[in-house]
Amino acid sequence: MTHPLHIAVLMGGWSSEREVSLTSGNGVADALESLGHKVTRIDMDRDVALRLAEAKPDVVFNALHGTPGEDGTVQGMMDLMGLTYTHSGLTTSVIAIDKELTKQQLVPHGIRMPEGIIVESESLHAGDPMPRPYVLKPVNEGSSVGVAIIKERDNHGVPIHRDSHGPWQTFATLLAEPFIRGRELTVAVLGNRALGVTELVPSSGFYDYEAKYTDGLTTHICPADVPADIAEAAMRMALDAHRLLGCKGTSRSDFRWDDERGEAGLYLLEVNTQPGMTPLSLVPEQARHVGLTYADLVQAIVDEALAGKAAR
């Protein structure tokens, strides 16, 4: 760092990931203050544009998760205001938050992703959209919010009962994908570098929202105990996805790996352009593995945002 900056940290908001965002944002703000920066913490509300205009920051650190901080809405607002901000821009955010648009962007370039179909939630009560087991997920939510695995003879019924609890009660449309057996892997990318591969072993068997953000519910194995060619393939796919989508700052790519099929069993599930920065989050964990402190990581994200401004 050459000189202290005034940095607004945007956090909170009203998405289903509000609490995670507040934890991420306050952690980021504490780190920036420890580095000597002036920090304005903004818990985003409907008056966010006014508050940013009043703050006049050198750069905005976007620590929001979910809508509207991850879907291009806030990015478009900050573009109109002429603000410099961290992480991905408008177009990338619009594409990456939508799992189907992400597939359309990445699969033609050889990145393996599960085939899926968009289904009307109402239709699920008449019959399954594909053979079980399969996964139902919202098209544009993160942190495994609203994800359900539909198994043979499970307690959702055959077909899914109308009164059975699941994402079909909340979302009008869902993405249905074949369930991929195997192991959960994730790769963080910082700038132009894939940091490593972590395996996630949730105690419940499914890496859902609670498992992600509750201490002790998921074991993180970093680096993952996988063959070198699988680790290299996952990091290559994550870096390719980061570049093809036009991600900035940091991203996190989530994978399923069927370890009975070798590299052919490695599937990219989604790319998160606003990955968590909480004490349990995966990007800070992988950064530590390669020798970066939490403060180093935060500063690197800010530096890339400023470098992007200078290049324009």
UniProtKB/Swiss-Prot annotation:
Mg(2+) 1 binds at residues 254, 270. ATP binds at residues 130-186. Pfam families: Dala_Dala_lig_C, Dala_Dala_lig_N. Its EC number is 6.3.2.4. The keyword Cell wall biogenesis/degradation applies. It catalyses: 2 D-alanine + ATP = D-alanyl-D-alanine + ADP + phosphate + H(+). Residues 103-303 form the ATP-grasp domain. GO terms for biological process: cell wall organization; peptidoglycan biosynthetic process; regulation of cell shape. The keyword Ligase applies. It comes from the Bacteria. Binds 2 magnesium or manganese ions per subunit. Gene3D superfamilies: 3.40.50.20, ATP-grasp fold, A domain (3.30.1490.20), ATP-grasp fold, B domain (3.30.470.20). One of its GO terms (cellular component) is cytoplasm. Pathway: Cell wall biogenesis; peptidoglycan biosynthesis. Belongs to the D-alanine--D-alanine ligase family. HAMAP family: Dala_Dala_lig. This is D-alanine--D-alanine ligase. It comes from Rhizorhabdus wittichii (strain DSM 6014 / CCUG 31198 / JCM 15750 / NBRC 105917 / EY 4224 / RW1) (Sphingomonas wittichii).
